[in-house]
């Protein structure tokens, strides 16, 4: 829920699912569930799509993208076969959410992008795809 609130509005052309144990008054077209398991079930059930959205949503039947927070990341890592991670090469002093440690005995680097620089912040970052060993 907190991650969704930080984004401010639903991400376009996809089904947005919020996982919240406390419930959440989400805008139309956003699905709210109690657990990660329910989120995966909602993602795979086309009946969860409001008819107005169904023609606009790009479907990825075999992929779910988890965008936070820390507890959800840790749960998703236990069942994922692949992770696409943006590594930002900086330290944020007042950060309150951290991605769990990626255990090299479980995950291997399958692909790594070149290092990019964000023009607004000046932070260097790269995209790394990990696959389960």
Which functions belong to the PLM regions below?
Residues 1-133:
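Enzymes that bind and transform nitrogen-containing heteroaromatic metabolites
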């Amino acid at each position: 829920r907190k991650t969704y609130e930080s984004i401010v509005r639903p991400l376009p052309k996809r089904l947005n699912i919020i996982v919240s144990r406390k419930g959440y008054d989400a805008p139309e077209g956003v699905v709210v569930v109690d657990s990660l398991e329910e989120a995966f079930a909602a993602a795979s059930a086309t009946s969860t799509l409001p008819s107005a959205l169904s023609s606009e949503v790009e479907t990825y039947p075999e992929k779910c993208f988890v965008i936070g927070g820390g507890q959800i990341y840790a749960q998703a890592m236990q069942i994922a076969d692949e992770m696409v991670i943006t590594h930002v090469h900086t330290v944020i002093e007042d950060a309150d959410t951290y991605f769990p440690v990626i255990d090299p005995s479980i995950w291997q680097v399958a692909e790594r992008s070149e290092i990019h620089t964000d023009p607004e912040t000046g932070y260097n970052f790269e995209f790394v795809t990990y696959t389960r060993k």
